[in-house]
Amino acid sequence: MPNPISLSHFAFAYGRPENTAVLKAEPADFQVDEHIAYTLSGEGEHLWVWVQKIGQNTDWVAKQIASWAGITAKEMGVAGKKDRQAITRQWMSLHLPGKQAPDIGSLDVPGVTLLKAMRHHRKLQTGGLSGNRFTLVLREINGNLDQIETRLQKIAGKGVPNYFGEQRFGNDFQNLAKATALFQGQIKSPKRHQKSLYISAARSWIFNEILSQRVRQGTWNRAISGDVFQLEGSQKWFADDSDPSLSKRVEEKGLHPTGALTGRGVLPSQSDAFQVEQAVLEKHPFWQAGLEKLGLKQERRALRVLPKEMHWEWLDQQTLSVGFDLPAGSYATMVMRELFEVKLED
């Protein structure tokens, strides 16, 4: 396990920012709106509710809604967890076959409002979102405003490294220690959800180290020999070292180079890309062996993420509002990392 544990040593695409800011001074400063990739049918056994929560934990909110509807937590569907210290809006589904939909205005849970409801024939699956819209307010900004504007333009035009954020690793990075304990057999019969968190933490840290090395090389946003690519807007990836047009497609942002979400089997990368990934895996043989033993298959994640529909406005000389869309699995805090040294008021 890395020691000391921090994200600060991971490389910055545009240099470590000298500007500072405070984020999440209040929940309204961090707003998230979930996007799903399909249209609700208006009929079916599942009632989908558009949930706004303020300062509440996603799992706790889902349990309260399940209790209100008279169903079990297993009959609830949630695509993904949202920040607690925030105002978030997301879909949740309730399995109500042959039952009348309850009055959404009757829910009485602190910090939770059901804004609308619609029937659909399927349950909302974990990961069943296409992305999120973030609206952030950064306060107490200290720095050069011209430099901040320059960085904003770079982020909007070129994207940022697609690091996993601190949320992935738990409070004080405890999920990394738990992953080590899990692989050592010290955690007996872990709950499925907890086990998944610990495994993901170790895998994500390895990916971040691979990405950081590519950032240091200046190749996080361009193709190198042996790369594996992912289509923009898709989870599909492929390896092809013979097509010279791929480098141009990466430059044009239609393709992204990827890094390993490691598991069992041989890395699909080759040549220079393989050397970068293999060097990182050799630093974490215990984690790698644990992931292989659990049977996780090799997967990939884009090294670059492009914030879409990015807009910003100065509310005053020390307060900046920024909005952008990110695909599912990418972190707004990692976008802000390239702009400010951010103090999170969690």
Swiss-Prot record:
Keywords: Isomerase, tRNA processing
Reactions listed under catalytic activity: uridine(13) in tRNA = pseudouridine(13) in tRNA
EC class name: isomerase
GO BP term, pick one: tRNA pseudouridine synthesis
Coiled-coil residues: none
Limits of the TRUD domain: 159-305
Endoplasmic reticulum is among the record's keywords: no
UniProt-listed Enzyme Commission number(s): 5.4.99.27
One GO cellular component term noted in the UniProt record for this chain: cytosol
Catalytic residues as annotated in Swiss-Prot or TrEMBL: 83 (nucleophile)
InterPro entries named among the record's database cross-references: PsdUridine_synth_cat_dom_sf, PsdUridine_synth_TruD, PsdUridine_synth_TruD_insert, TruD_catalytic, TruD_insert_sf, TruD_pseudoU_synthase
Single annotated GO MF: tRNA pseudouridine(13) synthase activity
Function: Responsible for synthesis of pseudouridine from uracil-13 in transfer RNAs.
Family, similarity comment: Belongs to the pseudouridine synthase TruD family.
Protein name: tRNA pseudouridine synthase D
